[in-house]
UniProtKB/Swiss-Prot annotation:
This is Ecto-ADP-ribosyltransferase 5. The active site is at R160, S183, E221. The gene is ART5. PANTHER family: ADP-RIBOSYLTRANSFERASE, ECTO-ADP-RIBOSYLTRANSFERASE 5. It comes from Homo sapiens. Residues 62-252 form the TR mART core domain. Gene3D superfamilies: Toxin ADP-ribosyltransferase, Chain A, domain 1 (3.90.176.10). Coiled coil: none annotated. It is found in: Secreted.
Amino acid sequence: MALAALMIALGSLGLHTWQAQAVPILPLGLAPDTFDDTYVGCAEEMEEKAAPLLKEEMAHHALLRESWEAAQETWEDKRRGLTLPPGFKAQNGIAIMVYTNSSNTLYWELNQAVRTGGGSRELYMRHFPFKALHFYLIRALQLLRGSGGCSRGPGEVVFRGVGSLRFEPKRLGDSVRLGQFASSSLDKAVAHRFGNATLFSLTTCFGAPIQAFSVFPKEREVLIPPHEVFLVTRFSQDGAQSLVTLWSYNQTCSHFNCAYLGGEKRRGCVSAPGALGTGDLHMTKRHLQQP
């Protein structure tokens, strides 16, 4: 189990460069151990808690403190000329800058914690070291993308290259989550540069374009949240490379909500639909599986 968690964590490098000699194969699934809080109904209360919580977490994590302070120093220059959605705070922009700075390993550590930190609320409270960063980053994506997913327009077609793992679905038509903050690009060539073990082609309804905030804007990055649900529509192999096509259900699914404020892990994954109803999902699934 520990080895599998490590392998999955390596896959969280996403657009960030990682070359491995041996490429393990892991199945795609719903990532049930992911910490997938969406803070529905408690964002304002979490805003009050997050600022002192961030200070506490930075005091215990030197890299988090250094990364946050470095991004904070450049945020005012970055935000000039940006049109920010209502409610978008400096902390949300700084969180994106911290995540996209691949010159250190903080994004990797965050995604490792996200992928393995959702076993229980107790596990999250005791051992998840990025509670404030997770909140600020999730809220940033929610505010940038807006509510309703694809109800406001078509999803983004993006690409994600992974160099450390070959992901394979169990079968076509499965529902899967990426189970982490997943970096992707509007540019297929960029995705190829960051990994050839697996190439994902995705249509995302909840991923947010973060190019304007990114430390590396030329990557044309779209950041996909851990809780978005996708349908596996195609899978093939090109030599040693897995080619996976995922289509968003326009739906998210979370076991946690407001965990820091007392919300326990729910036994089932609670769905939050966008524009499509259940019947529409079934129709879409049948349509997409046809050749």
